[in-house]
Amino acid sequence: NVCPEEGTFYRPSNSSSLMTWDKIYEYTPAPGQFINDLKSSGFTGSEYTPEDAVSYAERRLKDKIWVSLGGFGGYIIAGFDHSVKNNGEYELAISGNSFDGSSEPGIVWVMQDENGDGLPNDTWYELKGSETGAAGTIQDYAITYYRPAASGMAVQWSDNQGNSGQIDYLGQFHSQEYYYPLWISEESYTLRGTKLLERNYDASGNGSYWVQPHYDWGYADNF
């Protein structure tokens, strides 16, 4: 196969181009307290397929309301109706809800439509952040989440570093039956990415108040 010449499928912006995303291709969060939540997260309880999940995410984002990515590895794929040119400045903004002491750093990946088919199936590149190459950063981290055996239970997980744990069920705050995405039919699923060295700590000493300090630069939802 002959690769097309660089820039063949470049789509310059014009007067009708949107300033924001144009299409959501996939929404796959990790389990978490906001996943499937009918009250604060806007789920309907009938998101049973990946297509339902995409429709949910598009509806929320069109209304400029957040979507949760859950625990580690959750992701959303958004596309634009034009190419975003790298001018060496700030060309892309991702809004979050962080505040001082509550940063949840999200790593950003970008892709250009090299084959011109309009799908997110070309080469992805991770944008560098302040922790890239730092001691404690794990570049090829993978975590597997397991479907709870019954409603109201924690979500168990294991990773490729030999660790295991759980995402606690916090029914007093988020009482939906499951924190495991309803539209994921498999009994387990694995998410991959770069894991930063954790900075969060229990300021209360009893687990009631956790502080999540920010990282220097390069991450979404990072104060």
Predicted regions and their residues:
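A domain-level signal for the mature, folded cores of soluble proteins
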Residues: V2-G106, T123-F223
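Short loop/turn segments immediately following beta-strands, especially the blade-tip
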Residues: M111-D117
